[in-house]
């Protein structure tokens, strides 16, 4: 009888323990779902602000080269983009210290104004159209103004994007099972800016002219600055102590900030990721100027003068494919191995390169839409995955986002400078350079995957 009572008591205690564990599990799932919904709302507001900014700025990166060429400023567009990404690279070293000193919304707002100045420089250029090339309208003055504002934009871009990585990382850390969904959600909105931006560009360039294009985009950029200023704080009540600790931290000297970024190079995981981050930048630098080349090759003599408008039609599909890929890759990232997905994304770059070469041979305008779709998939997929990998493998480390943006911007600067130096060579030369970096990136990701698999077995 006593034995039966003891067994009953043990069963009751076991059931009670299981019941408590079940309740704790349900409570944890419920809390994570609440954090996910809160985080989703905040990321939605951040995404809309970024989408508005890059609706204004994004189309400029692809069209600016062609637009400035219409005024016989042959390399001005590519040089300004190079100035942006070159300064972006080295400003990334100190971005963490600046973000640490101010609130996210202040950093976002001030950084936004750098983009506004860069866009507004286009107003100055086209105000000088038809006037004597002297004073502030001289060639030297125009090159100086455009490149100065481009460099300012690069400095602001470093703080904007490192802050973006930190903001999203904080929100996604409260619901790790939905990390990929939240980051993919952001980049799908970013890609939507291409659709809106190029539809807007085609309307403005066709019916209102170049001056109106830069003027309205400057206004849109200021609107996004206000949207960023009213953003909510990313910290939830559950992790409010993180915010307090962050504010108490002292800003480290510049030398130490640079060391914090470079010390990551001793980490094998970070070291093998750098070629991948570099490739993402090369992709941006390549299609930002190459889409214009492919489209121009497909046009006849009468259509060439309207090349920027034809480019704007094509890049709408680049944005559409980016939106879809941003959503899809976010969902896949929460279910599958991130490195395998990244390897697949680098192989997608090869497909885009092959069809880009085909576009130069066939010279068919309809094929340019497929080429744009492929480059849009490459850009959105790889941009999303690089942030998800940095956020998952290096949680809470803003310096990893600095290293990521350093590699991105150097890769983009390299592609842009190659675009300038290889202008007298056949346009497919730049594609072979991209292909070379794609191979290196794929090999490094495969080695990193092998190392991780070995660690897991041990």
Model-derived features with residue positions:
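Helix-to-loop junctions at the C-terminal end of transmembrane segments
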Residues: 90-104, 205-206, 323-338, 422-424
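Transmembrane alpha-helices of Major Facilitator/SLC transporters
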Residues: 88-92, 289, 310-334, 345-352, ...
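C-terminal transmembrane helical hairpin of 12-TM major facilitator-type secondary transporters
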Residues: 339-382
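Glycine-rich segments within core transmembrane alpha-helices of 12-TM secondary carriers
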Residues: 81-89, 153, 157, 176-206, ...
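C-terminal ends and interior cores of transmembrane alpha-helices
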Residues: 113-139, 347-363, 416
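Hydrophobic core of transmembrane alpha-helices in multi-pass small-molecule transporters
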Residues: 51, 118, 132-160, 278, ...
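Intracellular juxtamembrane helix-capping segments at the cytosolic ends
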Residues: 60-62, 66, 158-174, 291, ...
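Extracytoplasmic gate region of multi-pass secondary transporters
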Residues: 57-62, 268-315, 383
């Amino acid at each position: 009888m006593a034995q039966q009572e003891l067994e009953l008591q043990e069963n009751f205690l076991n059931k009670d323990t299981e019941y408590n564990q079940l309740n704790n599990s349900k409570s944890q799932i419920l809390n994570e779902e609440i954090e996910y919904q809160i985080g989703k709302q905040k990321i939605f507001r951040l995404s809309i602000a970024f989408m508005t900014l890059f609706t204004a700025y994004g189309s400029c990166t692809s069209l600016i080269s062609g637009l400035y060429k219409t005024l016989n400023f042959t390399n001005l567009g590519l040089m300004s983009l190079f100035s942006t990404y070159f300064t972006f690279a080295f400003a990334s070293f100190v971005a963490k210290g600046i973000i640490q000193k101010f609130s996210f919304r202040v950093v976002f707002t001030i950084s936004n104004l750098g983009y506004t100045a860069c866009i507004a420089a286009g107003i100055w250029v086209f105000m000088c159209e038809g006037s004597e090339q002297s004073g502030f309208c001289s060639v030297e003055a125009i090159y100086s103004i455009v490149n100065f504002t481009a460099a300012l934009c690069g400095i602001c871009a470093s703080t904007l994007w490192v802050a973006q990585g930190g903001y999203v990382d904080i929100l996604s850390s409260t619901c790790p099972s939905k990390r990929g969904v939240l980051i993919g959600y952001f980049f799908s909105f970013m890609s939507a800016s291409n659709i809106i931006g190029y539809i807007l560009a085609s309307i403005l360039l066709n019916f209102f002219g170049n001056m109106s294009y830069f003027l309205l985009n400057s206004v849109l950029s200021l609107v996004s600055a206000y949207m960023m200023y009213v953003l909510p704080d990313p910290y939830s009540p559950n992790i409010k102590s993180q915010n307090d600790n962050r504010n108490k931290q002292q800003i480290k000297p510049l030398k130490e900030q640079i060391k914090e970024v470079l010390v990551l190079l001793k980490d094998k995981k970070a070291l093998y990721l750098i070629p991948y981050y570099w490739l993402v930048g090369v992709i941006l630098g390549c299609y930002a100027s190459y889409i214009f080349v492919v489209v121009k090759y497909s046009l006849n003599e009468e259509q060439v003068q309207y090349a920027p408008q034809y480019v704007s039609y094509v890049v709408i599909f680049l944005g559409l494919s980016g939106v879809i890929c941003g959503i899809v890759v976010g969902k896949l990232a929460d279910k599958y191995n991130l490195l395998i997905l990244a390897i697949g994304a680098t192989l997608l770059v090869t497909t885009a390169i092959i069809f880009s070469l085909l576009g130069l041979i066939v010279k068919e305008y309809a094929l340019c839409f497929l080429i744009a779709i492929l480059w849009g998939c490459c850009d959105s997929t790889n941009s999303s995955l690089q942030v998800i990998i940095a956020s998952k493998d290096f949680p809470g480390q803003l310096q990893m986002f600095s290293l990521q943006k350093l590699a991105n911007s150097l890769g983009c600067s390299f592609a842009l400078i190659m675009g300038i130096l290889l202008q007298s060579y056949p346009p497919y030369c730049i594609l072979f350079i991209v292909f070379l970096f794609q191979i290196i990136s794929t090999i490094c990701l495969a080695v990193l995957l092998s190392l991780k698999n070995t660690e897991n077995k041990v």
